[in-house]
């Protein structure tokens, strides 16, 4: 099992990042909240990973720390929640925001995420709240809820298209993704910034 990668970022195509380790390129799926904190292409990154094997694919999911990975693992144990939906959840809100929503039993923020209806949100709250009790110590620190301020990639002509594609990959319908991006689009804005602001506005 691959649990950690340390290598050079070759390409960033949200929500995917290509990391080269020892001459091998690993394609890693990352929640956007983690993706924002990655360094630029050409720089070294350390990513904690979870390896998922399916009949038709072998996928790596990456996170900036072990706590985020732990939350992802707990999420995919929930009935009806697979890796794709877990990725969408942790892209739409930070890990700390999700923990807070569960502990406060707030259904509202969860049902705004793609693929989550009221029943799924209620089930998440019940199951995850029980799991949090079984974890030793605090799963996350208050610092995990800080606004991410890492520098964004330079804007490109197709930044809006990249942002829409990333939102679709996270589970939003194409028309909905286009509408979300068009609402907050501004000249000279990077795709990462567009994605972050679109997800924030959706909540």
From Swiss-Prot:
<dbReference type="InterPro" id="IPR011114">
    <property type="entry name" value="RuvA_C"/>
</dbReference>
<dbReference type="InterPro" id="IPR012340">
    <property type="entry name" value="NA-bd_OB-fold"/>
</dbReference>
<feature type="region of interest" description="Flexible linker">
    <location>
        <begin position="143"/>
        <end position="154"/>
    </location>
</feature>
<feature type="region of interest" description="Domain III">
    <location>
        <begin position="155"/>
        <end position="203"/>
    </location>
</feature>
<keyword id="KW-0238">DNA-binding</keyword>
<dbReference type="InterPro" id="IPR010994">
    <property type="entry name" value="RuvA_2-like"/>
</dbReference>
<feature type="region of interest" description="Domain I">
    <location>
        <begin position="1"/>
        <end position="64"/>
    </location>
</feature>
<dbReference type="Pfam" id="PF14520">
    <property type="entry name" value="HHH_5"/>
</dbReference>
<dbReference type="InterPro" id="IPR036267">
    <property type="entry name" value="RuvA_C_sf"/>
</dbReference>
<keyword id="KW-0234">DNA repair</keyword>
<dbReference type="GO" id="GO:0006310">
    <property type="term" value="P:DNA recombination"/>
</dbReference>
<dbReference type="GO" id="GO:0009379">
    <property type="term" value="C:Holliday junction helicase complex"/>
</dbReference>
<dbReference type="Pfam" id="PF01330">
    <property type="entry name" value="RuvA_N"/>
</dbReference>
<protein>
    <recommendedName>
        <fullName>Holliday junction branch migration complex subunit RuvA</fullName>
    </recommendedName>
</protein>
<comment type="function">
    <text>The RuvA-RuvB-RuvC complex processes Holliday junction (HJ) DNA during genetic recombination and DNA repair, while the RuvA-RuvB complex plays an important role in the rescue of blocked DNA replication forks via replication fork reversal (RFR). RuvA specifically binds to HJ cruciform DNA, conferring on it an open structure. The RuvB hexamer acts as an ATP-dependent pump, pulling dsDNA into and through the RuvAB complex. HJ branch migration allows RuvC to scan DNA until it finds its consensus sequence, where it cleaves and resolves the cruciform DNA.</text>
</comment>
<dbReference type="InterPro" id="IPR003583">
    <property type="entry name" value="Hlx-hairpin-Hlx_DNA-bd_motif"/>
</dbReference>
<dbReference type="GO" id="GO:0005524">
    <property type="term" value="F:ATP binding"/>
</dbReference>
<dbReference type="InterPro" id="IPR000085">
    <property type="entry name" value="RuvA"/>
</dbReference>
<dbReference type="Pfam" id="PF07499">
    <property type="entry name" value="RuvA_C"/>
</dbReference>
<comment type="subunit">
    <text>Homotetramer. Forms an RuvA(8)-RuvB(12)-Holliday junction (HJ) complex. HJ DNA is sandwiched between 2 RuvA tetramers; dsDNA enters through RuvA and exits via RuvB. An RuvB hexamer assembles on each DNA strand where it exits the tetramer. Each RuvB hexamer is contacted by two RuvA subunits (via domain III) on 2 adjacent RuvB subunits; this complex drives branch migration. In the full resolvosome a probable DNA-RuvA(4)-RuvB(12)-RuvC(2) complex forms which resolves the HJ.</text>
</comment>
<keyword id="KW-0227">DNA damage</keyword>
<dbReference type="GO" id="GO:0000400">
    <property type="term" value="F:four-way junction DNA binding"/>
</dbReference>
<dbReference type="GO" id="GO:0009378">
    <property type="term" value="F:four-way junction helicase activity"/>
</dbReference>
<dbReference type="InterPro" id="IPR013849">
    <property type="entry name" value="DNA_helicase_Holl-junc_RuvA_I"/>
</dbReference>
<keyword id="KW-0963">Cytoplasm</keyword>
<keyword id="KW-0233">DNA recombination</keyword>
<comment type="similarity">
    <text>Belongs to the RuvA family.</text>
</comment>
<dbReference type="GO" id="GO:0006281">
    <property type="term" value="P:DNA repair"/>
</dbReference>
<dbReference type="GO" id="GO:0005737">
    <property type="term" value="C:cytoplasm"/>
</dbReference>
<feature type="region of interest" description="Domain II">
    <location>
        <begin position="65"/>
        <end position="142"/>
    </location>
</feature>
<dbReference type="GO" id="GO:0048476">
    <property type="term" value="C:Holliday junction resolvase complex"/>
</dbReference>
């Amino acid at each position: 099992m691959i649990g950690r990668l340390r290598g050079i970022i070759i390409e960033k195509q949200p929500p995917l990042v290509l990391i080269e380790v020892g001459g091998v390129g690993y394609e890693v799926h990352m929640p956007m909240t983690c993706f924002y904190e990655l360094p630029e292409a050409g720089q070294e990154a350390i990513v904690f990973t979870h390896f998922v094997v399916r009949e038709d694919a072998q996928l790596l999911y990456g996170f900036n720390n072990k706590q985020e990975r732990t939350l992802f693992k707990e999420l995919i144990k929930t009935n009806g929640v697979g890796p794709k939906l877990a990725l969408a959840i942790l892209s739409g809100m930070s890990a700390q925001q999700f923990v807070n929503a569960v502990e406060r039993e707030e259904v509202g923020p969860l049902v705004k995420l793609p693929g989550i209806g009221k029943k799924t949100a209620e089930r998440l709250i019940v199951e995850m709240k029980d799991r949090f009790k079984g974890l030793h110590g605090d799963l996350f620190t208050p610092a995990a809820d800080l606004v991410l301020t890492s520098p964004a990639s330079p804007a490109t002509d197709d930044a809006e298209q990249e942002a829409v594609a990333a939102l679709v990959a996270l589970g939003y319908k194409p028309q909905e993704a286009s509408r979300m991006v068009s609402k907050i689009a501004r000249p000279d804005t990077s795709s990462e910034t567009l994605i972050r602001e679109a997800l924030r506005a959706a909540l």
